[in-house]
Amino acid sequence: MAVGLDRADKSNYALRLKEMFNKEIRLQCRETNISKMSSKFHDNLLTAMEKADWQQRELERIERQLVLNRQELEKRLLLEKELTRELEATKLQEATVREHNNELMECIHALKRATGTSINHDALPARVKGVTVLRNTDGDQWIPFDLAVTDTEGLNSLCQKLQSNNIDVNKWRQLVSLATEMSMKWNYSTPNRRDNAKVDIIEIDLTSPTNQIIL
């Protein structure tokens, strides 16, 4: 009877020992799984943090680029406004030049009709160049002229010559005044003559077939 109880105690002890051993194994497996899960969690966390850092740097880069783009856009808008102002100013200047040119051409045509004077348009406004015809009973005479608008002495001499032949010089003076104004306002340069010499008023007898004037 005592022997049977002893065997039963040993059997129970073995079972408890086995159960404890199995429980220890399960605990070790659980710890291993927890360790693996923890390691994976930390790896994922590190990856997420690195990705967050990259995204932050990328966001800062994009923000800097946006600031640069905004500054560039503002510069272009300012440049566009400046170009628009310059364009309007240029259009206004061109309109003023056209108006002056129209007035100048009107004077030229009126002068030609009133005095028989032809003007070289290409020489204006820096120079007053052309030829006038004096008609009288003794024969027609051509008076060519090529004067800078700043040559006051030459212009006065020509006006006196025209006036002495009973030619109205009002349109002539208006023409010279407009040419002088345009020359000063728009900074036209006065072409130099090849000989740099003062041009005298020359009378040419039209009755001679060999005399020709080319403007």
Swiss-Prot record:
It comes from the Eukaryota. The keyword Cell division applies. Keywords: Cell cycle, Cell division, Centromere, Chromosome, Coiled coil, Kinetochore, Meiosis, Mitosis, Nucleus. GO terms for biological process: cell division; meiotic metaphase chromosome alignment; meiotic spindle organization; mitotic metaphase chromosome alignment. It is found in: Nucleus; Chromosome, Centromere, Kinetochore. One of its GO terms (cellular component) is Ndc80 complex. Residues 43-114 form a coiled coil. The keyword Cell division applies. Transmembrane segments: none annotated. Acts as a component of the essential kinetochore-associated Ndc80 complex, which is required for chromosome segregation and spindle checkpoint activity during meiosis and mitosis. Required for kinetochore integrity and the organization of stable microtubule binding sites in the outer plate of the kinetochore. Participates in SAC signaling that responds specifically to disruptions in spindle microtubule dynamics. The NDC80 complex synergistically enhances the affinity of the SKA1 complex for microtubules and may allow the NDC80 complex to track depolymerizing microtubules. Belongs to the SPC25 family. Component of the Ndc80 complex, which is composed of Ndc80, Nuf2 and Spc25. This is Kinetochore protein Spc25. It comes from Drosophila ananassae (Fruit fly).
